[in-house]
Amino acid sequence: WILNNIDDFVSQLGFGFTYVGNEYKIKLDDRYNYIDLLLFNIEYNCYIVIELKVTELKKEHIGQIQVYMNYIDENIKKFNQDTTIGIIICKQDNKYVIKYCSDDRIIAREYQLV
């Protein structure tokens, strides 16, 4: 639903969110990776990396989004912008993965199909 209704999704997030791209292509070494959804927030002056997962939150998801956030910070973010924030939207949250995640820039949220 999110990728098919990006305008609605972005408007539900609140003020200041701007769509940058979905399946946003980045090159890590000799391989391409794709960020599910990349936004920019003009109020917070930072990029927002969003990863969509159809499973319970796993520690591998944290590592994946950290790589994407670091890539954006090192290759796209301007010097006057704040560090990138990551949001993982997953079928089921896992409080233990979040508890032991050392990066407070990452937020996990559950979704429900209606």
Language-model regions: role of each:
Residues 1-114:
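Charged, terminal alpha-helix-loop-beta segments
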